[in-house]
């Protein structure tokens, strides 16, 4: 494997974006990960959805007090995708929202795939059975935007759209929040991660003092996520 080759040749590796499972990162002392905590992104996404559901009665399309939701998931087996889905849904429940999963689809982090998958999901929720989708949970902003594309292409009026939430805080995602097409997004501090990777790489390359690096367990550098909704979207500017 790459990690075996790196260890055999004494070449440290800094991983980012896609987090290795703990067992793999522990295989050698010079393997590091810089990124955000996927569980935190899921928690914050769940909080956005739960807060909106409790504050805005219009989100509960059939008025049953239950948040019927669909999930657009990233790559199958991707650690971040699994964690984001689990924590977003569990957080809604912990915030006192009763939930019902109507469906899910793997869209591989891709906007076009998400549009196709969301369009297929929407055909299942025409109200004839009393089931209507209240919230669409996207593992990232691109898939959330794909869900919005599907809603725009449907004959569903905007006031009847499900609430859509995403993760990453991309420029287009932030614009969708401003336009009230998304309930909110969870901002991923990519600039902070780039700085931390550079700092860590410099310290490793120069055999410097790692005490200046905010390492967790000697291997992880975490940058915090934060919520962006219409109430605080100006913070993104």
Region spans (language model):
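Hydrophobic alpha-helical segments within soluble ligand-binding/sensing domains
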Residues: 33-64, 114-115, 169-173, 189-209
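Short, solvent-exposed amphipathic alpha-helices that sit
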Residues: 41-45, 79-98, 113-117, 146-150
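Flexible loop/hinge segments that line or gate small-molecule binding clefts
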Residues: 2-40, 44, 58-68, 170-178, ...
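Short beta-strand elements in bilobed, periplasmic/extracellular small-molecule ligand-binding domains
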Residues: 68-71, 93-111
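Exported/periplasmic ABC-transporter solute-binding proteins
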Residues: 133-135, 149-191, 195, 199-217, ...
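Hinge/cleft segment of the Venus flytrap/periplasmic-binding protein
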Residues: 65-68, 72-76, 80, 91, ...
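Solvent-exposed loop/turn segments at secondary-structure junctions
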Residues: 19-23, 39-40, 75-79, 106-111, ...
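Hydrophobic alpha-helical
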Residues: 1-10, 87-88, 102-175
């Amino acid at each position: 494997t790459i990690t075996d080759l790196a260890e055999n040749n004494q070449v440290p590796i800094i991983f980012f974006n896609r987090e290795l499972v703990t067992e793999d990162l522990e295989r050698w002392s010079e393997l590091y990960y810089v990124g955000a905590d996927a569980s935190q992104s899921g928690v914050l996404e769940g909080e956005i959805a739960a807060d909106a559901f409790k504050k805005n009665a219009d989100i509960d399309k059939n008025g049953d007090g239950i948040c019927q939701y669909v999930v657009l998931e990233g790559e199958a087996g991707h650690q971040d995708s699994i964690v984001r889905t689990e924590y977003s849904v569990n957080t809604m429940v912990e915030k006192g929202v009763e939930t019902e999963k109507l469906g899910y689809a793997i869209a591989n982090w891709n906007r076009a795939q998400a549009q196709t998958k969301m369009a297929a999901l929407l055909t299942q929720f025409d109200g004839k059975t009393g089931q209507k989708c209240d919230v669409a949970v996207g593992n990232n902003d691109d898939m959330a935007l794909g869900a919005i594309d599907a809603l725009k292409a449907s004959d569903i009026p905007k006031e009847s759209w499900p609430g859509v939430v995403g993760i990453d805080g991309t420029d287009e995602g932030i614009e969708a929040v401003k336009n009230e097409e998304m309930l909110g997004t969870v901002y991923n501090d990519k600039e902070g991660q780039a700085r931390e990777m550079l700092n860590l790489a410099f310290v490793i390359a120069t055999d410097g003092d790692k005490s200046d690096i905010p390492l967790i367990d000697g291997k992880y550098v975490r940058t915090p996520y934060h919520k962006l909704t219409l109430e605080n979207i100006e913070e993104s500017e």
